[in-house]
Amino acid sequence: MEYEYFSQRGMEDKLQEFILMINNKERGGFNAMLAPRLVAADWEQRCCTLAYYAEPWMSNPAGITHGGILSAAADLTMGMLSIYLAQGNGITPSASISVNYLLPVPLEKDFWVTATADHIGRHLNQFTCSIVSAKEPDKPCVTAIGTYYVHKLYKEK
């Protein structure tokens, strides 16, 4: 059964495909070690939420999730949404990311990363992102803004 790429089902299926690609093709790679899981996607709001589990190896010296891990999870989530919104026909490397750490993210618990598209352009996509503990979804622990360069793999006709 075919469906439109730009639809609720199309978005969910494509994001799940990206996650499977990371887990299968990047075995041992950093993104695969983060092990993202799709929690929700909302085509109308142009946003998605991925879950990550804060493994003990992700700790900083204070015994909480390292800020670099949280930044990488935000980047990966915004980047996946950017690739989807670029119609999957290109790569969208990070051009800039700004991260604000508000509260610690505990280890050995799930945290959720929600990315929302603010601007989708021909050459740049911009997103906002928030990270929350899955047990306290109303308390943002981290916020981020990311800009992604849209590099088409082939020219539009």
Protein language model regions, located:
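HotDog/MaoC-like acyl-thioester-processing domains
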Residues: 1-16, 105-107, 118-157
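Intrinsic-disorder/low-complexity, polar/charged segments enriched in Ser/Thr/Lys/Arg/Asp/Glu/Gln
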Residues: 33, 45-49, 96, 110-112, ...
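Conserved positions in beta-strands of structured domains
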Residues: 39, 100-102, 114-118, 132
